[in-house]
Structures are given as C-alpha cells and as structure tokens.
Design a protein with these regions (language model features):
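A sequence-level detector for low-complexity, Ser/Thr- and acidic-rich stretches
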Residues: 1-253
Length: 253
C-alpha cells in the first residue's frame, strides 16, 4: 500500500525445504529497481541454525514467466554490495547463491536444492528510481522450524499501512492442492515483541484487497489477514498451522 514518506526496503523469508521442494518468492516494483537476491543455506550455520540447505540455487523470472537470470554459487564481486545494503557477509567459496538484477514490475525468484534443509531468501533494494511495492512467498509450512518466517523493513520518516495475508484454503482455486487449512499469522517488532496476530480475516478487508491488486478471499474461509500501520523499522511475520497442521501457504505483503 502507498505512503508518501515511507516505503518497503527489503524482504527476507526463512523456511525449510524438503527434498524436491522449491520456495517461490515474488516481488513487485513500481518503476525500475536494481535488486539483490540471495539464497542462503550454509552461511546460516554461523547463527546457530542446523539442517541447512547445502547448495541453494536461484532462478529469477519476469512477469511473462521467462527466466531472466539464475545463480548457483555467489560471485565474490558482489561482496561490497552486501555491506552497502546491510546484509551479513558470506564466506568466500561457500555454496550460497546471490544475483544482482534490474527489475521492473513483477518478478519471481524460485529457490531449490539439491537436498533439503533450512534456507533464507533475501531481496534487497539496491537503487534506482522505482520502489518496492509488494512481496509474496509460497511454500509448504507447518509448525516450529517448519513455520514460514518473513522479515520486512519499513524505511522512511512516516508510518506505513500494510495489508498482510496468509492464504491456504483459497489456493485450491488456483490449482494448488494441500493448502494449509487454518494458517496463523503473527507479527513481531525489532525487540521480538508480538504486536499483532490473527488466524482469520475480516470481510471488511475485501474491498481493500481489490484496491491493491490482491485476489478476493472466500467469505468464511480460515485464511488470515491483518491491516497494520507500522512505524519505520524492521518487523517479522510468522505463519504456522493451527493445531500442528501443515500445508501450502501463500504469504502476501
């Protein structure tokens, strides 16, 4: 959603990928933006995480679903950009992935193995006249380490109003089977304090969803949505399954 003095600066998604699974992360820019996309597995060991995706790959697609870039092992020439955008350093020679690409409109990054494990996907605004306006991620999620964690940063001097959704059951209408029947959405601030949560949605949000280009949710469904006004700073959204359930879920911002 729009704001005069604030904007989305970056997005990060952490989840667990099973064998032969992929994580889809979409983002939209209004105008041309240079974006840095990273898929990190081995480097997460430095933060105490285990069961990591050993060799993540990134494939980047445009709005016409044409592949426009891909990467397996990151190029050390990008290391200075990591510092510029505030990203943590990667170990030289690691099998993490990263690519730099000018994007305009809707782009989709698909992250896959080989193998299985936890992966962190990051999308950074590096520069350009446009702005990052929305983001989404879809994956099979459950509880605990199998929850989907999405980090976002609101940049600027004013608060920004965001519509945040976790969609499970509605995905069946788009040919996606096994949608998470009852997703729960929790939002945390920079101090890890929970500031909002929901496991349903209010039908009064339906017109608002249409105004920002989001598809309608089915009245009475157990999909979840929150409308929040957030001050500048970092936030984390967590999506998990109620009652230790698992299934495909779409996170939208």
């Amino acid at each position: 959603m729009t704001g005069q003095s604030s904007h989305l600066r970056n997005l990060a998604v952490r989840t667990h990928l099973g064998p032969a699974q992929s994580l889809t992360v979409g983002f939209g820019t209004l105008g041309s933006k240079t974006m840095l996309v990273r898929a990190i597995g081995p480097a997460l060991a430095a933060f105490g995480l285990r069961d990591l995706l050993p060799d993540p790959t990134i494939a980047l697609y445009d709005a016409a679903a044409a592949k426009i870039d891909e990467n397996n092992d990151w190029n050390p020439a990008l290391a200075h950009l990591f510092v510029d955008v505030g990203a943590f350093a990667l170990t030289s020679g690691s099998t993490d992935a990263a690519l730099l690409r000018a994007c305009n409109g809707t782009s989709t990054a698909r992250i896959a193995g080989p193998g299985a494990g936890v992966v962190l996907v990051e999308v950074y605004d590096v520069g350009g006249p446009g702005r990052l306006v929305n983001a989404a991620a879809r994956n099979l999620v459950g509880t605990g380490q199998n929850s989907l964690l999405a980090g976002l940063v609101v940049d600027g001097t004013a608060a920004k109003t965001l519509l945040i959704r976790g969609v499970g059951a509605r995905l069946a209408d788009f040919g996606v089977t096994g949608g998470l029947a009852d997703p729960k959405l929790e939002i945390y601030d920079a101090a890890c304090a929970k500031i909002a949560e929901n496991d349903s949605w209010n039908v009064q949000l339906q017109p608002l969803a249409g105004s920002v280009g989001a598809f309608d949710l089915t009245p009475g469904s157990r999909d979840t949505a929150l409308l929040l006004t957030l001050a500048p700073g970092p936030y984390t959204a967590q999506i998990s399954g109620i009652g230790a359930t698992a299934g495909e879920v779409l996170f939208e911002l």
